[in-house]
Amino acid sequence: MSDEETEQVEEQYEEEEEAQEEEVQEEAPEPEEVQEEEKPRPKLTAPKIPEGEKVDFDDIQKKRQNKDLMELQALIDSHFEARKKEEEELIALKERIEKRRAERAEQQRIRAEKERERQNRLAEEKARREEEDAKRRAEDDLKKKKALSSMGANYSSYLAKADQKRGKKQTAREMKKKILAERRKPLNIDHLSDDKLRDKAKELWDTLYQLETDKFEFGEKLKRQKYDITTLRSRIDQAQKHSKKAGATAKGKVGGRWK
């Protein structure tokens, strides 16, 4: 017998049982009424079984049990599958967290290393600049010492040569320069300390700078004066040319006729 036929027989059997139960409930006496005589019990009839076929109720029961077991097993499998999936997701989440933590630690390490390198580089550059500044100051001090040492000798020799050329034709300014050169003491800076020598060099440097500034201003003033003189001479020449032309025109025309 096939599964469909077995199910049909089973459903027919259940329907007949339900019909018999309903008949028994309808025929049952009400509790308030007392029946003196018992009514005959209804006769239960077995479900009709198709002729030529035999129904195996054990097989039906076994199939029901197998079906229930399969459904239960499916529920169990789905439960364990969902639990396994949750565990896998939890493991993956933990791995991502650990990976992110490791990446963050690596980034912090790289950032700290770069910061150390930057600080070391800044310190090296600062030390190099300080060394270069000290070297440059030492060179400047040495140049100033040489310039100051040679300044007096050069200035004195210059005045001596000028005196020899001019001889007795010295002006008041030349006499003043000569007197100042004679009164000027030689520059003795060997006994000075570094600080005093630096101050002395600064003082002389400021004086020299002021002299150069005055020289530049006098030169510019002289240029302006030369330019003014040249412009004035040019204007005078132009005026003289125009006056000569006007005089020649007046001489050539007499009585309304040309000579």
Swiss-Prot record:
Modified residues (N-acetylserine): S2
GO molecular function, one term: troponin C binding
Region (Disordered): 1-62, 101-180, 235-259
Record SUPFAM superfamilies: Troponin coil-coiled subunits
Keywords on record: Acetylation, Muscle protein, Phosphoprotein
Residues modified to Phosphoserine: S2, S78, S149, S156, S157, S193
GO cellular component: troponin complex
Compositionally biased region (Acidic residues): 1-36
BP GO terms, sorted: muscle contraction; regulation of striated muscle contraction; skeletal muscle contraction
S-S bridge residues: none
Protein name (Swiss-Prot/TrEMBL): Troponin T, fast skeletal muscle
Encoding gene (name): Tnnt3
